[in-house]
UniProtKB/Swiss-Prot annotation:
Keyword Hydrolase: no
Record-listed Mg(2+) binding positions: E69
Entry keyword annotation includes Metal-binding: yes
Compositional bias segments (type: Acidic residues): 429-445
One Pfam family this sequence matches: Tubulin_C
Native species: Triticum aestivum (Wheat)
Phylogenetic lineage: Eukaryota, Viridiplantae, Streptophyta, Embryophyta, Tracheophyta
Protein name per the record: Tubulin beta-3 chain
GO biological process: microtubule cytoskeleton organization; mitotic cell cycle
Keyword line: Cytoplasm, Cytoskeleton, GTP-binding, Magnesium, Metal-binding, Microtubule, Nucleotide-binding
Binding site for GTP: Q11, E69, S138, G142, T143, G144, N204, N226
Amino acid sequence: MREILHIQGGQCGNQIGAKFWEVICDEHGIDQTGKYAGDSDLQLERINVYYNEASGGRFVPRAVLMDLEPGTMDSLRSGPYGQIFRPDNFVFGQSGAGNNWAKGHYTEGAELIDSVLDVVRKEAENCDCLQGFQVCHSLGGGTGSGMGTLLISKIREEYPDRMMLTFSVFPSPKVSDTVVEPYNATLSVHQLVENADECMVLDNEALYDICFRTLKLATPTFGDLNHLISATMSGVTCCLRFPGQLNSDLRKLAVNLIPFPRLHFFMVGFAPLTSRGSQQYRALTVPELTQQMWDSKNMMCAADPRHGRYLTASAMFRGKMSTKEVDEQMLNVQNKNSSYFVEWIPNNVKSSVCDIPPTGLSMSSTFVGNSTSIQEMFRRVSEQFTAMFRRKAFLHWYTGEGMDEMEFTEAESNMNDLVAEYQQYQDATADEEEEYDEEEEEEAA
C-alpha cells in the first residue's frame, strides 16, 4: 500500500494537524479511541495509507508530532482525538524557539532533531511501500519554519526518492503575528525551494476572507481556518484512500504540476464552501463545483490568480459523478479563460475522480494550481525582508545563535530569483521559446 507519513511541527502545524486527523478519522470511521466504528468496507480497504493497525484492532495514525515547547502538545493530547496517537511519537523540547528561525534550525531544533528522526525512521520501517511525507508547518514562527525545514532537509538526505509534500502557512499581508516573520519566511523558502517536492501555500488572511465572505462567520477562529485547510489536505490524498475512476497520487500530482523543478509552490482551493447553516439547501452540480473551485475568492493564499497565468492545475473531484461531465467542465474552463493559461503547455489541467465524497457532502472538489501569480506572495515577503535587513533590524537574535549575515543575503537572492523565474514564464509565449535557449546558452558561455 502507498503509505504517507504525516509530520507536524510547531504550534501552527500541530493545530492544523490535529484538525486534519479529526477529518481523516471521520472519513474512515475511526472513533476517538482508535477503534473502527464505520459502516462501509471501503473505509477499511486502504486505511493503511494513514494508519497502522495495532493489537486489539486499534488504528494508530502514522503521525510524528514535534515542537520545541510542550504547550501545544499538551492541549492536543487532552483534545478530542489526543488518545489515538502513539505516545512515543510526541517529540518535544522545553525551551521553545521564540519565533527565532535560527533557534529552530541551528541550536534548539538541532538538539532535538535526532530524536525526531528516530521516530520518523521507526514509522517509515513500518510501511510496506512508503510513498512520501506530508509536513504541516508555518513559515512565520521559529519551530515550524526553522526546525521544520531542518527536518525536511534531513529526510531528503535519507529518503531521496520519496515525495515530500508540505502544507506551509505563509505570513499574511495584513495579519502579522510576529515582527520577524519576513526573516523566518525567507529563510524557510530558501530551504523549501531546494528540498521539498510540492508546497501547498496557505495563508491566514485568505482563509479569514473565505470565512467572512463565503462562510459568513462573524468571528472566525483558528479552528475554522484549520478546518478549511484539512478539507483540502484530505482532498489531495482521497484518491489514495478510496477507489476512484481516475486516480492520482503525490507523484502523479507532482509530475503533472511541476514544469520546472523550482516552481513547486501551489495555490489550493476547495469547493463547495457553504456557510455552516445552509448546507442542506444546496443541490451540487459539477458545473457549480467547477465554477467555485476556479474562483479567485476560493484560493487559500493571498495571491490573485487573475494577476498571473496558470502553468498547470489539477482538479480532484469526489462523489458520484460522470467523468465525461468533469472533462467537459475542465475543457470549458480552459477554453473560456484561455488567456489565464500559458499556451506553451497545451493540456495543462489534470483531473481525477474519487467515488467517495467527504462526510456530509454529496460531492466536492479540491483544486491545486501552479500559477505564476504566487510570486505576489514572495514579492510581498521579500519587500518586508529587505526593509528590515537593510537596517539590520533584529539581526542580533539570529547572529547570536551562530548564523551569518551571508545566509540572509543568500536566502534573499534565492527568493528574488524565484520571483524572477515566475515572471519569466508568465511572459513567455509559445513562439518565443528559441530566444530563451539562446539566452541560456550565452549565460552558460
